[in-house]
Amino acid sequence: ALVGLLLGVSFVDVTDPINPFVIGVLPTETVSSLWRDIKVYKDHAFIVADNVYNHGVQIFDLTQLRGVTEFTVFEKTYHYDKVGSVHNIAINEETGYAYAVGIGSASQSEYMCGAHIIDINDPSNPTYSGCLGDESTGRYGDGYVHDGQFVIYRGPDSDYYGKEIAFTSNETALGIADVTDKSNLKIISKFDQLNFGYV
């Protein structure tokens, strides 16, 4: 099990669920955070932290855990630094793209947007692929995306069948976009939310 901590991530062996034990930790990239999100793709963990300056995305090769019998403090495999504070990271396993959302102001301005797109087909060598944002949304009119799902559409609409579609929560609206071509992202629609808030 991968468990987010204030100061990093712990790796817990749950082979025997009655007697789980911590085999090691990966320290945080920066400072303590109450919010840490972890997703897994191709035997790699992708770790982000909210409200933490310059945390970025820590990438950890989980195969390093194999055969470990004593508590170990691990080092990251790679640090993706084109974002800073990130609320959540969504991964479309069918396409090999990650979407960093809920990006805080600590992010490098040229990469700041609603959903920051990262090509993770080679997990230990991620590359920036684009920015999705609808500036008619977000409480500051900046296209902020708090959470999202990114899927291959296989529904009844033939115009979008087989395309990679983003469904995003943008504070003031719910957004739908075609993110198939990372160099030509297309807003499809939005549904405005009145009296929005966080609970």
Predicted regions located by residue number:
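Feature marking well-ordered beta-strand scaffolds used for ligand recognition
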Residues: 1-199
